[in-house]
Amino acid sequence: MKRRRLGILGGTFDPIHVGHLDAADAASAALALDEVVLIPAHDQPLRVSEPRATVYHRFALAALAVEDRPHWRVSDMELVRQGRSYTEETLRGLHDSGWRASQLFFILGSDAFAGIASWHGYPGVLDLAHFVVIERPGAAIAEADMRAPELRCRTSPPPKADESFEGPMRIFLVHAHTRDVSSTMIRKRLASGLPIDDLVSPRVARHIQKHHLYGAVDNLHGEDQRI
């Protein structure tokens, strides 16, 4: 019997945007995931600056972004834990909770994966979940980033939807055409009074405008205030 496949997408989500959703969609399609859980970070160790929005708003924005996706949800486990948000601790927490029977697939971009050797708990963290690395055009993983034996030996093409597999955790490289957008870009546009309609979901844009997050102004969407 095939175990449930649970996709995990972590991040500061400051704010969450269509690029995050594109990455999770690509992973979900390639790995036939049964469910996707977004986990906003309280404080990412490798992030230079503090999040601009509070944990409340970042969680709310993530929840609004997936509101119309029945098999997606948002977990507050890292926000409740507070302090530094380490992937190793989060994955261990999932194993110790009700997700023990599921296969875990940790979704991340190729840029984040390139620095995985500096992660807390490396290389042991690789044994806690399958890693799904999203490669978008112009951002493929460099061959040098895969030279380490513990990475090279795990790399594998995505399994078929009906394939049941156990054993060592793998690293799946998924090529995807995700939209080129970043949270930094969105914050800069908001601070300049520019629209972000194509960069975030309508519900996310409305919440940002309502609470004046990231310097958003009242006329963010011009005269159309219905969204």
Residue ranges and their predicted role:
Residues 1-227:
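Nucleotidyltransferase catalytic core that binds NTPs
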